[in-house]
From Swiss-Prot:
Gene of this entry: rplD
Full protein name: Large ribosomal subunit protein uL4
Keyword Ribonucleoprotein appears in the UniProt entry: yes
Protein source organism: Desulfotalea psychrophila (strain LSv54 / DSM 12343)
MF terms in GO: rRNA binding; structural constituent of ribosome
Keywords: Ribonucleoprotein, Ribosomal protein, RNA-binding, rRNA-binding
Length: 211
């Protein structure tokens, strides 16, 4: 089967066009199905939920052994225990208990979703290919300056091997994240307005996402 390709410009860190590259449309320009993206984002966010909310039932609340007052003759409503959910300080009916919110989607759906998220950014014109991105030292100011030159106010940068210098340089600059190819996910793609692919990572992504 013949591959259909789209051609995009490759720029350097001075925002100058230095080359062109072909992207496989099966990965970077496919039909975007929002319900699949929604399911995968929901899966990712559910996996991060702590699930630690907990309340006590009437059995677990302290006290309540003795009947508060006799059944008849007081003029008050009958009561059997101070731990009743009707009482202030009593137990909670059907309250939350610690639980695992995570659920799984099959691998093929997850791969398709990453490809669709990349395609969405490509179709918007928000997918940028950078020839290389190297920093010799940890310099936040230099990183911020490069982002300004590239006209990127909010971006996810995907690299084959993110250097420690680069990762630490962007840490204190709001709106940016650097991920290795294997860490690329739907939530982070959709969270950022632009996606920057450093050129060598494209081959890795094509191998990973061809399903």
């Amino acid at each position: 089967m013949e591959r259909i390709m789209s051609t995009v410009s490759v720029v350097n860190t001075n925002n100058e066009k230095v080359d062109e590259i072909e992207l496989n449309d099966a990965i970077f320009n496919r039909e975007v199905k929002e319900y699949i993206l929604h399911d995968v984002v929901r899966m990712q966010r559910a996996a991060k939920r702590a699930g630690t909310a907990s309340t006590k039932t009437r059995v677990e609340v302290r006290g309540g052994g003795a009947k508060p007052w006799r059944q008849k003759g007081t003029g008050r409503a009958r009561a059997g225990s101070r731990t009743s959910p009707l009482w202030r300080g009593g137990g909670v009916t059907f309250g939350p208990k610690p639980r695992d919110y995570s659920f799984k989607l099959n691998r093929k759906v997850r791969q398709q979703a990453v490809s669709m998220a990349l395609s969405a950014r490509f179709q918007e014109g928000n997918l940028i290919v950078l020839d290389n991105f190297i920093m010799d030292a940890i310099k936040t100011k230099e990183f911020a300056s490069t982002m300004k030159t590239l006209e990127l106010a909010n971006a996810l940068i995907v690299m084959d091997d993110a250097s420690e210098n680069l990762s630490k340089s962007c840490r204190n600059v709001h709106g940016y994240r650097i991920l290795p190819a294997e860490g690329l996910n739907v939530y982070d793609i959709l969270l950022h307005k632009k996606v920057v692919l450093v050129k060598p990572v494209i081959e890795s992504l094509e191998k990973r996402l061809m399903v």
